[in-house]
Amino acid sequence: DDVFRAGRNGSESFPAILESHTPLDLIIIMLGTNDCKTVYGATAGIIGKGVETLLEQVKKYSPDSDILLISPIYLGENVYKEGFDVEFSKESIQVSKNLEAVYEKIALKNNIHFLRAQDFVSCSETDQEHLDAQAHKIFADAVYKKTDEILKARFIKAAC
């Protein structure tokens, strides 16, 4: 839970969102960067447990959906420094890098699709944590290709 901003725990509203949008062919989950903030003191493993909670909710409320888990980009090396985002620390950078291995294991364990954002883009130099406009376009293209692949396979399987 975000101690500074109420209503930021997505797992509380996620079941209602899933139920109200069923049936869903594909659910995409990409989160974890904000969980790297110093205030939470979370490791990549702890953040991964949160992802697993969401996956359990998907399996309960939308069991026929395909799932794509995306590991987020790494935080920039200067993100914690003055002029950037002091809610992060030097340790936060390593936690953000560790997320991809944790998420990949979760994807394999749960037999779901996986994509690494860092394979396509990295954070902007401007703020050391978000994508710039060009990176958004590149990443959107990568996600489109992956979702197209998943949905084509899904529809071929359904037609058989």
Give the location of each predicted region:
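Short acidic/His/Gly/Ser-rich catalytic and metal-binding motifs that mark active-site loops
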Residues: 37-38, 76-81, 122-125
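Conserved SGNH/GDSL esterase-like catalytic core that processes O-acyl groups on lipids
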Residues: 1-63, 94-98, 130
